[in-house]
Amino acid sequence: NPGVNNPNLLKPAGPVDPEISFISVKSLDDKPIALLANYSLHYVGGVPAGVISADYFGVFAERMAELLSDRWQDPPFVGIMTNGTSGDVNNINVQPKEIKRYKPFEKMKIVAFEAADAVFAQLSNVKYAEWVPLAAEYTEIPLAVRKPNEELIAWANEILAKPMDAPKKHSLERHYAQRTLDLAKWPDQIACPLQAFRIGDLCVTAIPFEVFTETGLEIKDRTPLAKTFTIELANGSFGYLPTRSQHALGGYETWLGTNRVEVDAAHKIADTLIEMLERLKKAN
């Protein structure tokens, strides 16, 4: 998030994953039952203050129902869009030639409709099977929690002791000061829940962090099965999950309080999931 047309912008900090993965389920009499998709893009936002929104995920679900089913279908069709590995990918063009202003809900509809229409266009190529092997695995791995040192705790207390209207060196200093003190109360390690599901030659993995796209692409590249995609913020929300290289760059996703676990966490999680997928590959 460098801001629009920031003159200090050098290059993107990481890769993107433009692929939309999906699982389509229908009955033996060809009636659509459900479709679960996965896309690596941060939520879009753009709603009035005080409004709670399902964002493009919800709009995608509605659009898929419009495209695939009769509104009176019973039971009703279920469309689902899941959040892919998009902890470091958002929808903002930071170098636009012309800045466009969107109306409330407008941009999320653009994203959702383009995604839904792209999936719909590929449905004719889907090969359905009456039977596929199913398998699942769950595990928890310990991850060390990053803790503030005494100097940082003293800084946080000093910041929070100031009046709310005191001049700030950084607009978010009170926010991060509070996060620092909160993290000091965390246990020394957490149990990180990880899941992997096999559906035929497809696998789905689940991670309880805002996962960087680099990690999602690594899992896709290393998977022992034909296709794999990852759902982030699944079974928990433990903050951002930068890679070692991103920690070295020092973006805000690596700051203490935004990131809460050890530097090697992303790599430990990826390695564990690949081991789980290897076992699922052998399952019949």
Regions found by a protein language model. Name each.
Residues N1-N284:
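Non-catalytic substrate/cofactor recognition surfaces at enzyme active-site rims
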